């Protein structure tokens, strides 16, 4: 048989129907139809339009934002270097490929030191798109408290735990510009 297929939390799917406690969905980024327990699907209004799109390129380590001005017309709002998630289990993993909905925002996303319950610092202007993956500014490690604008490593190699790190001013732009549940993050290779 096909076995179990797991999509990441926040992945965009098309709603096809429902039976009992299940929704029938078709993921946008892979072919097929699946029955998924209702508790794992958040239905958006069928009139939802995604006019704000963030594209993250893991291969080139950069990020771009696009805004739909009208049907068929898109404007590039920004293009910047970034770093994505690296493969270093158990604490760091690659930024997942796919199409996700911006779900939550935190002006300061507090993170823990690897393997510890101790606060490691915070990432400014964090916009969550799947599980623990955020688009955010340059991390600020304790004991430091002031925001850091830029890091020499942006645009080089994967360095984060799963997130998309970019200049803090650009993270603030995305944070302010991309409405929750009406913006997409598309991660490509």
Question: Residue spans of the language-model regions?
Answer:
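Flexible, glycine-rich surface segments
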Residues: 78-112
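SH3/SH3-like beta-barrel superfamily modules
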Residues: 7-39
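Solvent-exposed coil/turn segments that connect beta secondary-structure elements
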Residues: 18-20, 28-30, 41, 59-61, ...
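Short, small-residue-biased leader/transition segments that mark boundaries at the very start
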Residues: 2-6
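Solvent-exposed, polar/charged alpha-helical surfaces in well-ordered, non-transmembrane soluble domains
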Residues: 8-11, 61, 169-176
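A structural motif detector for short, solvent-exposed N-terminal "entry" segments of globular domains
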Residues: 36-89
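Exported/periplasmic cell-wall-interacting domains
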Residues: 95-97, 109-189
């Amino acid at each position: 048989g096909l076995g179990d297929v797991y999509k990441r939390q926040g992945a965009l799917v098309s709603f096809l129907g429902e039976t009992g406690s299940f929704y029938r969905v078709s993921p946008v980024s892979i072919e097929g139809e699946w029955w998924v327990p209702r508790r794992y699907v958040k239905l958006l209004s069928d009139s939802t339009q995604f006019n704000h799109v963030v594209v993250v390129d893991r291969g080139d380590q950069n990020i771009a934002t696009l805004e739909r001005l009208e049907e068929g017309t898109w404007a590039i709002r920004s293009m910047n270097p970034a770093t994505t998630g690296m493969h270093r289990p158990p604490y760091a993993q690659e930024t997942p490929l796919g199409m996700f909905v911006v779900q939550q925002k935190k002006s300061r996303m507090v993170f823990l030191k690897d393997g510890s319950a101790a606060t490691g610092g915070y990432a400014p202007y964090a916009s969550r798109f799947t599980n623990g993956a955020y688009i955010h500014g340059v991390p600020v490690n304790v004991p430091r408290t002031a925001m850091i604008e830029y890091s020499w490593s942006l645009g080089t190699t994967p360095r984060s735990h799963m997130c998309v790190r970019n200049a803090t001013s650009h993270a603030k732009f995305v944070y302010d510009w991309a409405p929750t549940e009406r913006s997409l993050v598309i991660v490509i290779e």
